[in-house]
Amino acid sequence: MARVHNFSAGPAALPTSVLAEIADEMMDYRGCGMSVLEMSHRSSMYQQIIDDAEATLRRLLSIPDNYRVLFLQGGATLQFAGIPMNLMRRGRAGYIVTGNFANKAYKEAAKYGEAVLLASSEDTNFDRIPTMADINARIAAEAAGDGLDYVYICQNNTIFGTMYHELPNCGDVPLVADVSSCFLSQPLNVERYGLIYAGAQKNAGAAGVTVVIVRDDLIADGPAFAQTPQYMDLKTQAAKGSMLNTPNTFGIYVCGKVFRWVEETGGLAAMAERNWAKANLLYDLLEQSELFHGTTQGDSRSIANITFRTGDAELDAAFVAGAAEHQIQNVKGHRLVGGMRASVYNAVTMEDVQALATYMKDFEAQHGLSQRSN
C-alpha cells in the first residue's frame, strides 16, 4: 500500500529514509546479532548510540558546553511540573499563556509557588501572540519588583497555529520554552534560553522521548524543592547521563537517526527554507480562498501548524472525510477548536502539501460560495 499524506500533529510523519534505516537494522543492529530494542542501556554499544545522538544535536543547534542535553520521558506534561520543581527557587515565575499547553503549564506551576500571568491571548481565542512591547514591559516591572525565577513560553502553539517570531526580552531572568512543535524546524539560538524542552514526537523522533536542554548554573544547586522526586531532579539526570533509570532506548535511537537526517539534508537553515515554503503555500491559498479562512493573525502564523476552517461545521467534516478518500490523513482540527489543521513538520514533503492544496482547491470548486448559491 502506498504511504498516505500524513499531516498529524503528533505523533507525526517520520522521514522515509529514517524509517527504512530502522527497518533494516531492526533484527540485527550493525552486526551485533540483536535489535536496539533488546540491547542493554548499560552496554558500550548503546552508549555510543546515545552519545552520537547528543553530539549530532549539539552540532545542529551549536549548543554551548555549559548546557546539558537530556533525553527524558513523560512528555511535555511532566515538564509542566518539573520546571517549577527545579527552577522556582524564590517561589515566583512568570507565564505567558498563548494556548492550551501554556495554560496547562501555568496552572501546574501554581501548585509550587506564585505563577504570575504576564500576558495572555485568551481574549481573542489564542489567535495571536501578545504584543512584545507589552510583554517586555511587564517582565521588566515584575523582575524589578518581587522578582521572577524564570519566564515561561510555549514557543509554537500546536492547537491554535500561532508562533513567537520574536522572543521576550527577559534581561537576567532565564527564559524557559516549550518548543515541542517547532523544534529543529529552523535555527534556534540556545543561548537566549535558560531551558528548552521538546517532545520528540513532532519533529525529532518517535513518541516517548522528551529532549531537555538546560544551562548548567540553573541546576547546579539541585532542585528548588527538597521533596522533588529523584527522576525529576535535572541535576541528577545530567550527572547520570539521562540514565538514572532505563531510558527510552529505542526512542533515543530514533531521535539520533532524525537528528542525523536533518544534518545531512542541509541543517536547520535549509530546513527552515523548506518549511516556510510549505507553510506559505497553504497560507497563500487561504488568503485567496473564498471558502476557507485561516484562524490566526498574520504576524503570529506558525511555521508548523496551519489552522483553518470554512465556518460551517458540517462542511468542515465533509472536507476531512473527503481528504481521507484522497489519502490525506490527520487534517481534522484539535477537539478543542474544531475546523482543520495541517501540521507540516520537517518530514512532511512539499509533494504532500501540494496534494493537500490541490484537494482544497477542488473541494472549494465543488462546495464554494458560487456552488452553494446555485
Show where each model-derived region lies.
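PLP-dependent enzyme catalytic core of the Aspartate aminotransferase-like
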Residues: 2-4, 334, 338-374
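A glycine-/small-polar-enriched, mobile loop at the entrance of the PLP active site in fold-type I
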Residues: 3-54
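Active-site phosphate-binding strand-loop segment of PLP-dependent enzymes
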Residues: 10, 109, 121-183
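Conserved N-terminal alpha-helix of the aminotransferase class I/II PLP-enzyme fold
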Residues: 33-79, 86, 100, 108
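Conserved PLP-anchoring active-site segment centered on the Schiff-base-forming lysine
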Residues: 88-103
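Conserved active-site segment immediately N-terminal to the catalytic lysine
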Residues: 176, 190-201
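Active-site C-terminal subdomain of aminotransferase-like
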Residues: 200-283, 297, 367
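Conserved PLP-binding catalytic core of the aspartate aminotransferase-like
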Residues: 292-322
